[in-house]
């Protein structure tokens, strides 16, 4: 809980800065580039976690990362702030929180849509239209197929779940019959 609070605080500050400067999308790309380096080079996060490395050495490593990713000056300053505040360990959580907050800022929802089979373009468009109408936001769905489903669709947007699966409908009918 504390970790996610820290990550959200830093991500929110970065989204606000990005909004002021018109760089929300650029920051998203720069964060993704740095996160890719962290993921593909395990020595990088290990270096920031190493208490034997001096603070100045860690800042130099971050400066090298910023240079190799061609990050903006603002992003570079943000990443150096993470080093100064000893928050680099929260970087992946900050990136995730930034993505969510940036999406919210620009009016994007990324629902997870689960079905028993692959949706065709018409079905997907109908679901997307309904969600856009209900939410008044742009919908970028993540599609998953669960062969355990009998049929129907489950849409999850954040903590909200819209469940129109056959299993849930059968359960409702069973509950109504038992109530008599």
From Swiss-Prot:
Record's function text: F(1)F(0) ATP synthase produces ATP from ADP in the presence of a proton or sodium gradient. F-type ATPases consist of two structural domains, F(1) containing the extramembraneous catalytic core and F(0) containing the membrane proton channel, linked together by a central stalk and a peripheral stalk. During catalysis, ATP synthesis in the catalytic domain of F(1) is coupled via a rotary mechanism of the central stalk subunits to proton translocation. This protein is part of the stalk that links CF(0) to CF(1). It either transmits conformational changes from CF(0) to CF(1) or is implicated in proton conduction.
Subcellular localization, as worded in the UniProt entry: Cell inner membrane
Cellular component terms (Gene Ontology): plasma membrane; proton-transporting ATP synthase complex
InterPro entries hit by this protein: ATP_synth_OSCP/delta_N_sf, ATPase_OSCP/dsu
Organism of this sequence: Pelobacter propionicus (strain DSM 2379 / NBRC 103807 / OttBd1)
Protein family according to the UniProt entry: Belongs to the ATPase delta chain family.
SUPFAM superfamilies in alphabetical order: N-terminal domain of the delta subunit of the F1F0-ATP synthase
Top-level lineage group: Bacteria
Membrane topology value: Peripheral membrane protein
Main location (coarse class): membrane
Entry's Gene Ontology molecular function annotations: proton-transporting ATP synthase activity, rotational mechanism
UniProt keyword annotations, A-Z: ATP synthesis, Cell inner membrane, Cell membrane, CF(1), Hydrogen ion transport, Ion transport, Membrane, Transport
NCBIfam families in alphabetical order: ATP_synt_delta
Subunit structure and binding partners: F-type ATPases have 2 components, F(1) - the catalytic core - and F(0) - the membrane proton channel. F(1) has five subunits: alpha(3), beta(3), gamma(1), delta(1), epsilon(1). F(0) has three main subunits: a(1), b(2) and c(10-14). The alpha and beta chains form an alternating ring which encloses part of the gamma chain. F(1) is attached to F(0) by a central stalk formed by the gamma and epsilon chains, while a peripheral stalk is formed by the delta and b chains.
Protein name, as recorded: ATP synthase subunit delta
One Pfam family of this chain: OSCP
